[in-house]
Curated annotation (Swiss-Prot):
Interacts with CAF4, DNM1 and FIS1, components of the mitochondrial fission machinery. Interacts via its N-terminal, coiled-coil extension (NTE) with FIS1, and via its WD repeats with DNM1. GO terms for molecular function: ubiquitin binding. Changing residue 605 to E: Abolishes interaction with DNM1. The gene is MDV1. Keywords: Coiled coil, Membrane, Mitochondrion, Mitochondrion outer membrane, Phosphoprotein, Repeat, WD repeat. This is Mitochondrial division protein 1. Residues 240-298 form a coiled coil. PROSITE patterns: WD_REPEATS_1 (PS00678), WD_REPEATS_2 (PS50082), WD_REPEATS_REGION (PS50294). The modification Phosphoserine is found at residue 376. One of its GO terms (cellular component) is mitochondrial outer membrane.
Length: 714
C-alpha cells in the first residue's frame, strides 16, 4: 500500500469514528456497541484487512510475540530496543519531546483515582502540591486509604538505610582486594540479616525532622519562620501516620500468616497423633498374638492346620474335638480340680503344692522368649509446649492416690488409692479404664512397671509383694466388659506373691533380674524374679533413732494425718549391685548388694526421707523437712538444695541436676539446680494438693488427693 493510500485510510478512519461517536451522543445507545454496530466503520475495518493481503501480514510483522523492526523503521516497538536512548528515538520529534509525551499524565486522570469510599477526588482540576497530595485530600488523609505514592515515599528512608548498610558491609576495611573466605561471607550474610531485621527500628533519627530546631522555636520572633516550622512538623506527622498505617498493615499480614501456620501445625499434630494411635493399636495386636501363642504352647492346645481349604469343615470339627480332649486331659489341673485334690492333703502339703505351681509359672514367665520389645515409642508429647496439660482422668479412686506408674507416654497407667485394695489400669491415650487387679488385703503403698515383660510389682500394707501380668489382666477385664462368659483360665493376673516381710511394704525397686523391697519391719530384702526366692535380708536396726519431728505441721498434710507414723524406709532405688536408701533418720545410704554393706552415707536432711532418684552422676532426695537436695555421687557432696513451704511427698528425676517435685501443693514444681530456677505445672482453679508423680520422656503424670489424675507435657 502506498503512502497516499495510507493517508486516505487515516482520513476515512477519523471521519468514520467521529461520525459514529456523534451519532452515539444523539441516540444514547450502549457505549460498548458504538463502533461494532456502525456499518461504515465495519466496512473500513474489512477493507483494511483485505488491503493487508491476508491476516498473515500481521503475523509476519511479529517474531516470538514481538513486532520486529521493518526496513522503513516507521513502527516503534519499545521491547525491541537494546539501549535506553532508543526508546525515545524516532523520525518525528526529538527525544526530550517524546519522553514528555510518553510520560505525561493529565490532571484529570490523577483526579479520577478512586478512594477507599469509592468517591473521586476533587473535580476542580487542581494540580498535586509539592507534598504529592491534593490539599483537600491532605486534610482527610487520616480517613482515607494510603496511596501507593505515599507508601513509596514513606519507605524511601528505609531503602536509603539499607543501601548505606550494604555498602558498608561490602567495603573492605583492610583495604585489600584479596579473596573473601567462606567464614567472612557467612558473617557478612548474618550481619546483613541482622541489619534487615533492625531496619524498621528508626529510634531517634526521625523524632525531629530536618530544618526544625527546638531552640529556635522557643527564641524566634519571626511568624514566617514559625509557620515554616509548623508546616514541616505537620508534614512529618502525616509522614509518620502513613508509616504507622503501613507498619500496621504488615503486622496484620504477619498475623494472618501466623494463624495459617498455626492451623497447619494443628493439622500436622493431628496427623502425628493419628499415626501414633495406629502404632499403639498395632503394638497391642502384636502383643495379643504373642500372648495367645504362648498360651497355646504352654497348655498344648495347638491344632494341626489343614493342607487344603476343602477340609476346613472337618478341621473345625477336629479342632473342637481336640479342645474337648485337652480339656478332659487337663481337667485335673484346673483351679476347681486342684482345690478338690488339695482338700484331701495335709495343710502343709496344700501350701507346698500352691507354691510349686506359682514358682513354675514365675520361671516360665521370665524366660527370654517372654521379653517384649516395642517397635515404636510415642514422641507426640515432645511437640507440646512445656507445662501444657495434655489430659486428665477424673476420680480414679475415692481417696487420695498413694502411688502410680506408667510404662510409656500415652501407654498404660496403673494407680492405687488410700483404703482401696485394688490396682486400676488405664489407657493414657484414650484416658479410660482397661483393667483391674484385685488381691491385696490392705492399702497399696508402692508400685513399679516393667514394660519389657508387661508386668507390675506392688507392695502393700498387708506385708505382701505381688507380681502381676498386665496383659492378662486387660484381657480378662475386656471379656468381663463384653458380657461374654470368661474363659476358665488356669492363670490369674497375679503371677507370684513374695511373702517374707512382717510389716507393711513401704518402698520397692525393680531391676531386670532382681526386686528390692523395704518394709516397716526395718528390713530390706532382695528377691530373685525367676525363682521367687529371697536372696538376702539387710536389717536396719538404726531405723528407730529418729522420732516424729515437731517441726512438721501434721495438720497441713493429708497424708500425714492418715499415716501417723513416718516410714522406716521411705524410699529406695537399685541398679545392678548399687542400692540407695532413704530412711526415717533423714540419712541417705549407698549400699553394695554383693556384700550387703554401706559404702557411703549422705547426711543433711533433718526429717524422714520420702523419695529419692539417682542416675549416673547425681542423686536427688526429698524429705518431710520441706527440702529437695541434689548430691554428687562421685564426691558424695551436696550440690544444691531447694526449700519448699510444705513437706516433699514425691519426686522423680527430670534430667541431670533437675527434678519433678510434689510438695503437698496444688502444683507440681520442676526444679533445675544448674539454672537455679523453678517453674510449675498448675491447673487454674484446682486447689487440690498433688500426692504423687511420675515422669518419663517429657511426659508427666500426677495424682491428687481427690483421686484425679492429670497428664502434662514438660
Amino acid at each position: 500500500m502506498s503512502v497516499n493510500d495510507q493517508i486516505t485510510h487515516i482520513g476515512k478512519t477519523l471521519s468514520t469514528t467521529a461520525s459514529a461517536f456523534l451519532n452515539y451522543q444523539k441516540s444514547n445507545s450502549n457505549t460498548q456497541d458504538v463502533l461494532t454496530n456502525n456499518g461504515p466503520y465495519k466496512n473500513l475495518l474489512s477493507n483494511t484487512v483485505n488491503n493487508a493481503s491476508s491476516t498473515s501480514y500481521f503475523y509476519k510483522r511479529t517474531e516470538h510475540g514481538r513486532f520486529v523492526k521493518n526496513a522503513s523503521n516507521t513502527f516503534e516497538d519499545i521491547y525491541s530496543k537494546t539501549r535506553r536512548g532508543d526508546v525515545f528515538r524516532n523520525k518525528f520529534t526529538d527525544n526530550k519531546t517524546c519522553f514528555r509525551m510518553l510520560t505525561y499524565i493529565s490532571d484529570d486522570l490523577l483526579n479520577e483515582i478512586p478512594t477507599k469510599e469509592g468517591l473521586k477526588s476533587d473535580a476542580d482540576g487542581k494540580l498535586l502540591t509539592e507534598g504529592g497530595e491534593n490539599e483537600n485530600l491532605r486534610k482527610n488523609a487520616s480517613k482515607k486509604e494510603t496511596s501507593l505514592f505515599q507508601g513509596f515515599k514513606s519507605y524511601l528512608p528505609i531503602a536509603e538505610l539499607a543501601i548505606e548498610n550494604t555498602e558498608r558491609l561490602n567495603y573492605d576495611t583492610n583495604g585489600t582486594s584479596g579473596t573473601v573466605g567462606a567464614k567472612d561471607v557467612m558473617s557478612k550474610t548474618n550481619e546483613r540479616d541482622e541489619i534487615h531485621t533492625e531496619l524498621p527500628n528508626f529510634q531517634d533519627s526521625f523524632l525531629i525532622p530536618p530544618g526544625v530546631e527546638t531552640k529556635k522555636i522557643s527564641s524566634s520572633y519571626s511568624p514566617s519562620a514559625l509557620k515554616s516550622f509548623s508546616q514541616t512538623l505537620v508534614n512529618s506527622l502525616e509522614f509518620l501516620n502513613i508509616q504507622k498505617n503501613s507498619t500496621l498493615s504488615e503486622i496484620r499480614d504477619i498475623e494472618v500468616e501466623v494463624e495459617n501456620l498455626r492451623q497447619k501445625k494443628e493439622k500436622l499434630l493431628g496427623k502425628i497423633a493419628n499415626i501414633e494411635q495406629n502404632q499403639l493399636l498395632l503394638e497391642d495386636n502384636l502383643k495379643q498374638i504373642d500372648d495367645r501363642l504362648d498360651f497355646l504352647e504352654e497348655y498344648g492346645l495347638e491344632v494341626i492346620e489343614a493342607n487344603s481349604d476343602e477340609n476346613a469343615e472337618d478341621d473345625g470339627m477336629s479342632e473342637r474335638k481336640a479342645l474337648k480332649n485337652d480339656a478332659i486331659r487337663n481337667e485335673g489341673v484346673t483351679t476347681e480340680s486342684i482345690s478338690s485334690e488339695a482338700s484331701n492333703l495335709p495343710p502343709r502339703r496344700r501350701q507346698q503344692l500352691r507354691d510349686d505351681n506359682s514358682l513354675n509359672r514365675l520361671g516360665a514367665f521370665y524366660s527370654k522368649s517372654k521379653k517384649r520389645h516395642r517397635k515404636s515409642f510415642p514422641t507426640f508429647q515432645q511437640l507440646y509446649e512445656p507445662g501444657t496439660k495434655i489430659g486428665s482422668i477424673m476420680s480414679t479412686h475415692d481417696d487420695f492416690l498413694t502411688c502410680l506408674d506408667f510404662d510409656a507416654p500415652f501407654g498404660t497407667l496403673c494407680t492405687a488409692g488410700y483404703l482401696d485394695h485394688t490396682v486400676k489400669i488405664w489407657d493414657l491415650s484414650k484416658q479410660n479404664k482397661i483393667g483391674e487387679l484385685a488381691g491385696h488385703l490392705a492399702t497399696i503403698n508402692c508400685m513399679q512397671i516393667n514394660r519389657d515383660y508387661g508386668t507390675l510389682v506392688t507392695g502393700g500394707r498387708d506385708a505382701a509383694l505381688k507380681l502381676w501380668n498386665l496383659n492378662l489382666a486387660q484381657q480378662l477385664y475386656q471379656e468381663t466388659q463384653n458380657l461374654t462368659s470368661p474363659t476358665n483360665h488356669i492363670d490369674s493376673p497375679c503371677v507370684h506373691t513374695f511373702e517374707a516381710h512382717t510389716d507393711e511394704v513401704t518402698a520397692l525397686s525393680l531391676d531386670p533380674s532382681f526386686l528390692v523391697s523395704g518394709s516397716q519391719d526395718r528390713t530390706i530384702r532382695q528377691w530373685d524374679l525367676r525363682s521367687g526366692k529371697c536372696l538376702q535380708t539387710i536389717d536396719l536396726s538404726f531405723a528407730n533413732v529418729l522420732t516424729t519431728s515437731t517441726n512438721v505441721d501434721l495438720s497441713k498434710s493429708t497424708l500425714l494425718t492418715q499415716r501417723n507414723e513416718r516410714p522406716s524406709i521411705g524410699a529406695l532405688q537399685s541398679f545392678d549391685a548399687a542400692l540407695a536408701t532413704g530412711t526415717k533418720d533423714g540419712v541417705v545410704r549407698l549400699w553394695d548388694l554383693r556384700s550387703g554393706k554401706v559404702i557411703r552415707t549422705l547426711k543433711g536432711h533433718t526429717d524422714a526421707i520420702t523419695s529419692l532418684k539417682f542416675d549416673s552422676a547425681c542423686l536427688v532426695t526429698g524429705s518431710y523437712d520441706r527440702t529437695v537436695r541434689i548430691w554428687d555421687l562421685r564426691t558424695g557432696l551436696l550440690n544444691k538444695f531447694h526449700a519448699y513451704s510444705a513437706p516433699v511427698l514425691s519426686l522423680d528425676l527430670f534430667q541431670e541436676n533437675a527434678a519433678v517435685v510434689v510438695a503437698d501443693e496444688p502444683s507440681v514444681q520442676i526444679y533445675d539446680s544448674e539454672k537455679d530456677e523453678s517453674w510449675s505445672c498448675v491447673e487454674q482453679g484446682n486447689e487440690t494438693s498433688v500426692s504423687t508423680v511420675k515422669y518419663k520422656e517429657n511426659y508427666m503424670v500426677e495424682g491428687r488427693e481427690n483421686g484425679d489424675v492429670n497428664i502434662w507435657a514438660v
